[in-house]
Amino acid sequence: MEIENSSDLIIDGLYSFLSAGVDEVGRGALFGPVVAAAVILPEDVLDDLASTGVTDSKKLTEKRRCHLASLIRTVAWDCQIGIASVREIDRLNILKASLLAMKRAVLRLKLRPDLVLVDGNQEIRDLFIPQRTVVKGDSKCLAIAAASIVAKVWRDTLIMRLAKKYPVYDLTKNKGYGTKKHKQGIINYGVSPQHRLSFSPCQPSLFEVRS
């Protein structure tokens, strides 16, 4: 399915209003926060971004994501990050924490959008800005795809820094997701303070928490 150039939407062909795309990454990881990005793109860059291959971040190589994230930040009118911590994930559950990260990203925008395009089928609670959910939005909407790329690169950069502190979990390769080597590291060394204790592979009843 082709990406839609929907950073600016048109009502009745007369009124163009400002919209932000928002997406999160890291929902399925065992380690680290969930990270969201909110992006507002000017209409005159949409075709160029689409032609450069902006799409769902999961479909891109790491090198390509880094290049596109830098480009998106350069051309965007506004681009902000929101996170929900590991402890918030454990306290709220991963869905609520993901929506909280998205809300924080939107509220950090210096420009107030008239509409927020939210990836998925869940609206952001208590946002007080009109919003529209877009299922598989990172494959359908350019602004959401851009947000997914920015969020993914930001989170991966964070995990790479944390990997130096916690080398036993193979984080440089798995970026916090539950690979065989990551799970074996948990079995051998216990969990770190950055592991999500509400996720079954990280249950505190089974493993010692390492500082």
From Swiss-Prot:
Stretches assigned to coiled coil: none
Cofactor: Mn(2+); Mg(2+)
Cofactor note: Manganese or magnesium. Binds 1 divalent metal ion per monomer in the absence of substrate. May bind a second metal ion after substrate binding.
Residues reported in the UniProt entry to bind a divalent metal cation: D23, E24, D119
Family matches, as InterPro entries: RNase_HII, RNase_HII/HIII, RNase_HII/HIII_dom, RNaseH-like_sf, RNaseH_sf
Compartment(s) where it occurs, according to its Swiss-Prot or TrEMBL record: Cytoplasm
Record keywords, A-Z: Cytoplasm, Endonuclease, Hydrolase, Manganese, Metal-binding, Nuclease
UniProt catalytic activity: Endonucleolytic cleavage to 5'-phosphomonoester
Record's GO cellular component terms: cytoplasm; ribonuclease H2 complex
EC number: 3.1.26.4
Xref: Pfam families: RNase_HII
Domain RNase H type-2: 17-211
Matching Gene3D superfamilies: Ribonuclease H-like superfamily/Ribonuclease H
The protein's enzyme class: hydrolase
A molecular function GO annotation: manganese ion binding
Signal peptide: none
One of the protein's GO biological processes: DNA replication, removal of RNA primer
Keyword Manganese: yes
SUPFAM superfamilies in the record: Ribonuclease H-like
Family as reported in the entry's similarity comment: Belongs to the RNase HII family.
NCBIfam families assigned to the protein according to its UniProt record, in alphabetical order: PRK00015.1-3, PRK13925.1
Name of the protein in question: Ribonuclease HII
Organism annotation: Trichodesmium erythraeum (strain IMS101)
